[in-house]
């Protein structure tokens, strides 16, 4: 699949391949050059023309999503004078006809005769080789491997682009993350339900969410609600575990796990004569869900780009669910779950010879009613939450042969207004207002001493302040200074990366006790070895160790009655051993990864939700997590312009409490962490209609550390189906898609007493111009 997200089966350019001419007197030879693949069957490529005798040599394009390092398609025309399977030195090469000097020695008639003879010989070879199909020349198909970052990286990297969203039947951001190995999504159900991500049992607070490379901070809660990001407004989602794959990056991005959300404006600048392009989309789904969106990009030159995007989302979320309790079982509908969201973005990019500047501004507004837990068949609730966020960020990058550097700045403002209209049963104050402001600065530089050794330094500074109408958090702030020193060494098949991080935190709370200040040093090391480097098979072995450190959030420290300034910071130790393999034989390609890990968490902070807005926090002492992550991605081209795409993953997590050996909870699985989980999807792509079947599943879980029958969450599996098609209309493209979610109408819960939606449909239309 192309990294750009285009459908290689349905969206193909029809540019001609013939662009260069070689003149030999009256005989003109066409040289094939790299271009876009043509629709339908491979087109005839006229390569030689001499008078009235025209020799047609057909060149077929072998589409291989693993061939081109830049994400496109490597096009290798067939040359009968080359050995089969031997690639030429460049994508376009002239046929080995007699030298031009030799042709000059012949008269015009002789040259024409030579051309006719060559044409007859090639025509005879053509007819003998193609007895079954007289319209197709036998071709030599060369299959090579494209180097994926995920296969050669020292750390586990999983990435999905917009094409993968279609091929896997993904409908929202939470669904996309649920398809990644090692990820546990805590989902409160419905389009308006909060969705947070825990990776390898470490908790959501250890997962850093970045947008176009810069972190999305929420120091108040310590975790980011991924439901606010519209899947249609993302070009890719990337998960990096253990460490960051690149040597030079903001220090914030060196968290235990990083979810990087990539906007379409982060894609490479276009090199064409179309200065104006954009998209208009509409998504409609069950339970009165509407989601129109639009984006527009103006590119007056190949170095300048300005863009804007906006989307609006509305859903009643009054989906039906089933409560089972013997003869008292009932069919109910979710209440108080309506949600309305509006979001706008502005982007500007300027590129120079060695540098680039990218600036962005965003505003987000969300008003939703918070559905309560279903207790004794009562699911009504009177809570509401209004959230607003505005941020502006700018990032500058510079690079030459020996040096590279970056600098970035970001200002983030957030407002949350929580209301509970039933004051008789409200937990805490019935009206709570929070204002969060953050100033974030980061810079770094890398020196490449040779092709083998590089050294990088980066530093971050952040000032975060929180104010509210509650006495406990009326005015609190934190200053954070992070530094990292990194070194990498490459020699042949071996790659080694070393890092050292310094964390400094200063907490402030005028007139009251503040949380303790902290200074910590944490190391990280990762390595990879290319065990096999053949043409059709590459195998890498990798290993890594890292210590990660995080402070308690403001809610964990200061929230009235539930927060505590005595909470201790978390320190995690991660160990990873992995294997990656990539192979391609003919029409079949495969990418396989397997990673075994062992994590130790000291003084783990566990947030147990009372509802969508109020949390309880405690230190568990020590937690040990052992697990295995397996991923498989394979494609099979079954016919011209048709392929099967299979993607699957499996995760094994044994996350146990090891705090007190005499406690009743010693050795129990952590809350909401399934021991077995996985996902799979199978797509059949054709030029007429593409079909997808997908499933996600998880084993038994518990809502608390006490493993009681009342706290058990049964295992579940959810199936879905999708169909989509694209129409290319000149420079425009129309994409239509239909999804059937939870096709078998299963009733299940991910968070206890928050039922998930049952069978539902989703329709979408996207116009690209």
Feature names for model-found ranges:
Residues 451, 456, 493-496, 592-600, ...:
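Gram-negative outer-membrane beta-barrel transporters
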Residues 646, 697-704, 712, 723-769:
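C-terminal beta-signal and adjacent terminal beta-strands/loops
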Residues 231-279:
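A beta-strand signature from Gram-negative outer-membrane beta-barrel systems
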Residues 129-166, 174, 204:
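Short, acidic, small-residue-rich periplasmic hinge/interaction motif at the N-terminus
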Residues 404-420, 541-546, 570-626, 631-635:
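Membrane-embedded beta-barrel scaffold of Gram-negative outer-membrane proteins
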Residues 506-508, 515-521, 529-576, 596-620, ...:
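Surface-exposed extracellular loop regions of Gram-negative outer-membrane beta-barrel proteins
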Residues 317-321, 330-343, 349, 354-401, ...:
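Flexible loop and strand-edge segments within Gram-negative outer membrane beta-barrel domains
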Residues 174, 178-218:
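Extracytoplasmic beta-strand/coil segments of soluble accessory domains associated
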């Amino acid at each position: 699949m192309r990294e750009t997200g285009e459908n290689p089966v349905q969206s193909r350019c029809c540019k001609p391949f013939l662009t260069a001419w070689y003149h030999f007197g009256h005989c003109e030879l066409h040289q094939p050059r790299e271009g876009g693949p043509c629709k339908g069957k491979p087109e005839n490529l006229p390569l030689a023309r001499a008078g009235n005798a025209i020799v047609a040599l057909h060149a077929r394009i072998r589409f291989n999503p693993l061939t081109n390092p830049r994400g496109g398609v490597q096009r290798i025309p067939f040359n009968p004078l080359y050995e089969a399977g031997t690639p030429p030195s460049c994508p376009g090469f002239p046929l080995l006809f007699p030298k031009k000097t030799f042709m000059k020695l012949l008269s015009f008639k002789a040259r024409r005769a030579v051309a006719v003879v060559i044409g007859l010989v090639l025509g005879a070879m053509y007819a003998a080789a193609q007895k079954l199909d007289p319209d197709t020349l036998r071709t030599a198909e060369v299959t090579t491997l494209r180097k994926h970052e995920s296969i050669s990286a020292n750390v586990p990297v999983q990435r999905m682009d917009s094409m993968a969203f279609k091929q896997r039947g993904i409908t929202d951001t939470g669904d996309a993350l649920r398809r990644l190995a090692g990820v546990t999504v805590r989902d409160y159900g419905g389009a308006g339900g909060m969705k947070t991500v825990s990776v390898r049992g470490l908790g959501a607070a250890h997962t850093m969410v970045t947008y176009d490379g810069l972190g999305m901070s929420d120091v108040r809660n310590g975790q980011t609600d991924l439901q606010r990001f519209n899947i249609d407004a993302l070009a890719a989602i990337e998960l990096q575990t253990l460490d960051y794959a690149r040597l030079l990056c903001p220090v914030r991005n060196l968290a235990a796990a990083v979810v990087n959300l990539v906007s379409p404006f982060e894609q490479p600048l276009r090199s064409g004569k179309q200065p104006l392009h954009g998209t208009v989309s509409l998504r409609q789904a069950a339970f009165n869900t509407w989601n129109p969106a639009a984006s527009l990009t103006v590119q007056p030159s190949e170095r300048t780009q300005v863009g804007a995007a906006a989307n609006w989302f509305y859903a009643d979320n009054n989906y039906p669910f089933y409560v089972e309790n013997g003869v008292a079982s009932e069919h109910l509908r979710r209440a108080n779950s309506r949600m309305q969201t509006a979001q706008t973005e502005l982007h500007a990019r300027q590129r120079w010879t060695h540098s680039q500047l990218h600036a962005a501004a965003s505003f987000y507004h969300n008003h939703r009613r918070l559905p309560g837990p279903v207790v004794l068949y009562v699911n009504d609730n009177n809570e509401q939450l209004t959230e607003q966020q505005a941020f502006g960020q700018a990032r500058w990058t510079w690079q030459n042969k020996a040096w590279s550097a970056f600098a970035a700045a970001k200002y983030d403002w957030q407002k949350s207004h929580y209301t509970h209209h039933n004051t008789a049963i409200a937990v805490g104050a019935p009206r709570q207002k929070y204002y969060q402001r953050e100033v974030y600065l980061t810079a770094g530089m890398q020196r490449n001493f040779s092709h083998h050794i590089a050294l990088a330094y980066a530093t971050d500074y952040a000032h975060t302040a929180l104010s509210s109408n509650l006495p406990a958090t009326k005015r609190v702030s934190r200053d954070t200074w992070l530094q990292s020193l990194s070194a990498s060494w490459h020699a042949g098949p071996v790659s080694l990366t070393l890092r050292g991080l310094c964390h400094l935190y200063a907490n402030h709370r005028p007139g009251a006790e503040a949380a303790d200040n902290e200074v910590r040093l944490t190391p990280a090391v990762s390595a990879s070895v290319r065990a096999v480097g053949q043409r059709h098979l590459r195998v890498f072995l990798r290993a890594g160790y890292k210590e990660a450190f995080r402070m308690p959030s403001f809610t964990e420290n200061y929230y009235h009655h539930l927060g505590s300034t005595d909470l201790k910071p978390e320190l995690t130790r991660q160990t990873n051993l992995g294997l990656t393999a990539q192979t391609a034989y003919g029409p079949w390609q495969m990418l396989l990864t397997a990673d075994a890990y062992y994590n130790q968490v000291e003084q783990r902070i566990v947030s147990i939700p009372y509802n969508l807005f109020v949390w309880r926090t405690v230190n568990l002492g020590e937690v040990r997590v052992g697990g295995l992550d397996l991923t498989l991605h394979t494609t099979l081209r079954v016919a011209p312009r048709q392929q099967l795409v299979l993607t699957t993953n499996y995760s094994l997590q044994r996350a146990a409490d090891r705090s007190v050996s005499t406690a009743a909870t010693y050795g129990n699985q952590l809350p909401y962490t399934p021991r077995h989980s996985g996902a799979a999807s199978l797509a059949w792509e054709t030029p007429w209609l593409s079909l997808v079947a997908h499933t996600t599943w998880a084993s038994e879980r518990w809502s608390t550390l006490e493993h009681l029958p009342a706290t058990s969450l049964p295992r579940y599996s959810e199936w879905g189906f999708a169909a989509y098609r694209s129409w290319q209309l000149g420079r425009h493209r129309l994409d239509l898609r239909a999804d059937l979610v939870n096709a078998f109408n299963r009733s299940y819960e991910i968070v206890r007493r928050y039922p998930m939606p049952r069978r539902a449909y989703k329709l979408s239309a996207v116009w690209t111009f």
